[in-house]
Regions:
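Short amphipathic, positively biased membrane-proximal segments
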Residues: 1-324
Length: 324
C-alpha cells in the first residue's frame, strides 16, 4: 500500500469516527432531554418559586449541553487516548437529565442529586487531569502550554454544571412561606437559596470568563467583539456576588439587565464561532476538519446557561421583599 493510500484510509477512518462522535453527541443530548423531561412533572407552587426553579434547572441543562458537545469534540481530537476522557461527555449527559428532572420525595428523587454530584466530582477530577497534562510538558506552566495543551479550566464547566444543579435542588425544595416542616426542616428559605445560587453563578461567570480570556488572548483579540466575553460576564458575576451579600431593588434590576446581556452574548458568541469555523478552508463543507480546527462552537452558549441561573437567583432574592 502506498503512502498516499494509507493517508487516504486514515483520513477516511477519522472522518467516520467524527461522524460517529457527532451522531453520538446528538443522540446523548436528545436522550438526556427526553429522560429529564419525563421525570419533570408539573408542580403546584408559588409562580415566582416555580419560575426561579425552572430557570435555574434549565440554565444548568444548557451548561451541561455545552459541556457534552464541547468535551466530545475536544476529546475526540485527542483520540480518547485516556479512557477516562469518555467520562466527561457521558457525565454531562447525566447532568442534563438530572437538571431537567424535578426532585421527588421518594427514592427516585435521589437520582438527580446523584447526577449533579457525579458531574461535580468528574469535573473536579478533570481539572486535575488537565493540570497534569499542562505541567508534565517541557516548560511547565508556560504560555505555550497554557495555549496548546489541554485547556486548563475546561473541566470546570462540568463541575459548575453539577454545582448549579445541586444549588437549584436547594432552590426547588425551599419553603416559600418560611414554615419549615417535615422534609423542609433543614431546607434553605427561598431568599437563602437565591443567595447561594447567586454566589455560585457569580463565581462561575468569573471563572468561565477567565478561560475565555485565555483563549481569546491566544487569538490576539483580532476581532474587537472578542473583548465582550472578558468584560460583560465578569461584571455581571461581580454584580451577582454583590446582590448575594446585600440585595437591593436597584442593584437587582441592574444585575438583571446585565444577566440578560450575558444570555444574549452566549447566542451571539455561538454565531461568531460558527462564522469562525466557516472562515477556515473548506468552511462547513469540510466540517470534519474545520469544526476541530476552528473556534469551539458549543462553548459560548455556556454563558447563556449561567445567565439563566443568575436570573433565577435574582427572582429568588426578590421574593424576600415581596414576602415582607
Amino acid at each position: 500500500m502506498s503512502a498516499r493510500q494509507a493517508a487516504h484510509r486514515e483520513r477516511g477512518s477519522r472522518s467516520i469516527g467524527l461522524d460517529a462522535v457527532a451522531a453520538g453527541g446528538v443522540i446523548a443530548l436528545g436522550a438526556a432531554f427526553a429522560i429529564g423531561s419525563a421525570l419533570r412533572p408539573e408542580r403546584k407552587s408559588d409562580p415566582v418559586h416555580r419560575r426561579a426553579t425552572r430557570k435555574a434547572r434549565d440554565g444548568a441543562a444548557i451548561l451541561g449541553a455545552s459541556v457534552l458537545m464541547d468535551s466530545a469534540m475536544e476529546h475526540f481530537r485527542g483520540g480518547f487516548h485516556n479512557r477516562a476522557m469518555v467520562l466527561a461527555p457521558a457525565t454531562a449527559a447525566a447532568s442534563i437529565a438530572a437538571s431537567l428532572a424535578e426532585p421527588r420525595p421518594d427514592r427516585t428523587g435521589r437520582l438527580p442529586r446523584l447526577g449533579h454530584a457525579l458531574s461535580f466530582a468528574v469535573g473536579a477530577a478533570g481539572l486535575g487531569f488537565h493540570f497534569y497534562n499542562v505541567t508534565k510538558r517541557p516548560g511547565g506552566l508556560s504560555w505555550n502550554n497554557l495555549f496548546y495543551a489541554a485547556p486548563l479550566g475546561a473541566p470546570g464547566a462540568l463541575a459548575i454544571s453539577g454545582l448549579l444543579g445541586l444549588t437549584s435542588e436547594a432552590l426547588s425544595i425551599a419553603p416559600v412561606d418560611g414554615d419549615r416542616t417535615g422534609n423542609e426542616a433543614l431546607a434553605w428559605s427561598l431568599p437563602e437559596a437565591g443567595r447561594g445560587l447567586a454566589l455560585a453563578t457569580g463565581g462561575s461567570l468569573l471563572v468561565t470568563a477567565a478561560e475565555a480570556g485565555l483563549l481569546h488572548f491566544r487569538g490576539a483579540f483580532h476581532n474587537p467583539a472578542m473583548w465582550l466575553p472578558v468584560t460583560v460576564p465578569p461584571a455581571t458575576g461581580l454584580f451577582l456576588i454583590g446582590e448575594a451579600a446585600n440585595p437591593t431593588d436597584s442593584g437587582r434590576e441592574v444585575t438583571r439587565w446585565a444577566a440578560r446581556g450575558v444570555a444574549v452574548l452566549g447566542v451571539v458568541g455561538t454565531a461568531f464561532h460558527v462564522w469562525g469555523v466557516h472562515r477556515n478552508m473548506g468552511g462547513w463543507h469540510n466540517w470534519r476538519q474545520t469544526s476541530l480546527a476552528g473556534p469551539p462552537t458549543p462553548a459560548p452558549i455556556s454563558f447563556t446557561g449561567l445567565a439563566m441561573a443568575g436570573l433565577a437567583a435574582l427572582d429568588a432574592l426578590g421574593s424576600e421583599e415581596r414576602s415582607s
